[in-house]
């Protein structure tokens, strides 16, 4: 949206065409993980041969490495081998994540957990469970096994319960007390480690296919920013991007560090689908403990909407991406108001105010509630 506003001459575009101190841009390598796994026959391979080779090379030079996997825990999914069911949170419609250090399956959205000892399938009571997927804890274990002499630290929400912990880990890595820093997106932005000459992005596709119009922007931003952590001094840096979608324009533009080309393509897609910056958005969430009552409410509200106008699109009703959280069901309506008809968003604001004013008194809602978001960051 900011790039579009620059094009419309509403704001100035200040850029840094060169890296500070004359540092060179890193050399970027793309690893096609499907081809890599087919070649090696290891279809559960997490660290590609190229990334392993580059890590060893940097360790031999006494240089540091940053590895990014934007998913914490050990295994994001635990599945029964007998019936195929996923181990799910009983309060949220979310798969439980296995945390090996705690030996627990934990929901990242509420306080629910299951101890791994004597764990049975929730559906068929089967004993055989398969722990699949990769989180930061698994990456840490694999790197420990492959490079046992290296000193490794990990930075994610599990190791950084306070700002003191975060500062302590980053300071130790900056002082070269550790060789390898493994983390989530927390380590991708705004950090300066002159001796870090390799950044490895374990799974660059995470988040790429989430049903949100800003998903590709977030993935591009993560890769672009993470690449900027490598080679920030006189030492040349390298970046290894592991992906299952090597031909994706997002991956290609990130590889070439071509931010303007990415912006231009993204704007074309946003214009075609009438998303910001070409429209104003409002998201209205309907939340309650009874799924059928929540859906009945949202259907009734949509049916009774008054004073619709030209340029207004209404999406839904539809389940939110996270349909059930903390024993509450979540549905949403999304309102898109074209800026060509509604230049300052006043039509959309007036429409929402008029149609939802009745619900300011919560009595008609009972146990349900309605949340209204103008210009939401995400539609998830």
Model-derived segments and spans:
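Short, conserved charged micro-motifs
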Residues: 291-297, 340-354
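Inter-lobe coupling/hinge segments of SF2-like helicase ATPases
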Residues: 1-285, 290-295, 321, 332-333, ...
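A common structural junction motif
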Residues: 302-311, 350-366
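C-terminal effector/interaction modules appended to NTPase cores
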Residues: 326-328, 364
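Short proline/glycine-enriched turn/loop segments at secondary-structure junctions
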Residues: 321-324, 360-361
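Short beta-strand elements
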Residues: 153, 308-320, 364-375
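Short amphipathic alpha-helix segments
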Residues: 259-260, 293-315
């Amino acid at each position: 949206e900011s790039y579009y506003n620059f094009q419309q001459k509403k704001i100035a575009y200040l850029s840094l065409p060169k890296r500070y101190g004359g540092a060179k841009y890193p050399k970027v390598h793309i690893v096609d993980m499907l081809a890599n796994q087919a070649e090696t026959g290891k279809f559960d391979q997490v660290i590609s041969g190229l990334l392993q080779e580059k890590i060893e090379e940097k360790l031999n030079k006494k240089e540091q490495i940053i590895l990014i996997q934007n998913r914490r825990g050990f295994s994001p999914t635990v599945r029964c081998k007998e019936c195929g069911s996923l181990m799910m949170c009983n309060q949220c419609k979310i798969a439980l994540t296995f945390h090996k250090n705690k030996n627990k399956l934990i929901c990242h959205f509420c306080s629910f957990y299951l101890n791994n000892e004597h764990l049975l399938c929730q559906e068929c009571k089967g004993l055989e469970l398969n722990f699949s997927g990769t989180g930061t804890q698994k990456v840490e274990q694999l790197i420990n096994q492959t490079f046992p002499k290296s000193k490794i630290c990990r930075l994610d929400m599990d190791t950084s319960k306070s700002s003191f912990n975060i500062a302590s880990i980053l300071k130790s890595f900056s002082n070269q007390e550790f060789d390898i820093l493994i983390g989530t997106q927390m380590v991708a932005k705004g950090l300066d480690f002159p001796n870090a000459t390799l950044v490895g992005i374990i799974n660059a596709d995470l988040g790429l296919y989430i049903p949100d119009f800003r998903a590709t922007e977030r993935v591009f931003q993560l890769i672009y920013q993470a690449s900027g952590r490598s080679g920030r001094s006189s030492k040349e840096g390298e970046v290894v991007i592991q992906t299952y979608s090597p031909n994706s324009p997002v991956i290609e533009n990130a590889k070439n560090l071509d931010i303007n080309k990415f912006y231009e393509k993204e704007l074309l897609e946003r214009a075609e689908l009438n998303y910001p910056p070409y429209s104003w958005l409002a998201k209205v969430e309907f939340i309650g403990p009874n799924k059928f009552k929540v859906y009945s409410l949202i259907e009734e509200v949509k049916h009774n909407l008054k004073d619709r106008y030209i340029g207004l699109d209404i999406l839904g009703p539809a389940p939110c991406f996270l349909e059930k959280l903390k024993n509450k069901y979540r549905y949403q309506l999304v309102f898109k108001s074209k800026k060509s008809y509604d230049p300052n968003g006043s039509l959309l604001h007036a429409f929402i105010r008029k149609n939802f004013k009745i619900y300011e008194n919560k009595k008609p809602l009972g146990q349900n509630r309605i949340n209204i978001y103008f210009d939401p960051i995400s539609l998830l």
